[in-house]
Amino acid sequence: MVVPEDHIRQVERLSQNLFVCPPHASQVTALAALDSNDELQANVDVYKKNREILLEELPKAGLKKFSPPDGAFYIYVDISDYSNDSLAFCKKVLNEANVAITPGIDFDQKRGNSTIRFSYARSTKDIIEGAKRIKDFMSKYY
């Protein structure tokens, strides 16, 4: 930043308050979030149930090649038996089954053409409905 010589100290003080640490309000909010154990556990329980549903239902749809998720709330699935164009596959699923999944090409430009990513960070009702739609889609087209 270029400022007049006599303003340097004031700009330094301002910069320190803006960039050295998160704003005070954000820090207080983060602390409150950390104290929300019941809500956090409820979300974790929903994600766990949703993960179990997809791990059971995806193979029934023919999507059997995946590593069990360990960490976030995503399942990466190998679709090389059906397509080597994950973007086109995801577009077709969206247009035909009204289910949004993410093409692997978004994460790996070299090997992502044959993978897709499912998120299970939705309501359990949505996951059950999405799994049904995926099964119907796969049985219709593959």
Annotate the PLM regions.
Residues 1-142:
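PLP-dependent class I/II
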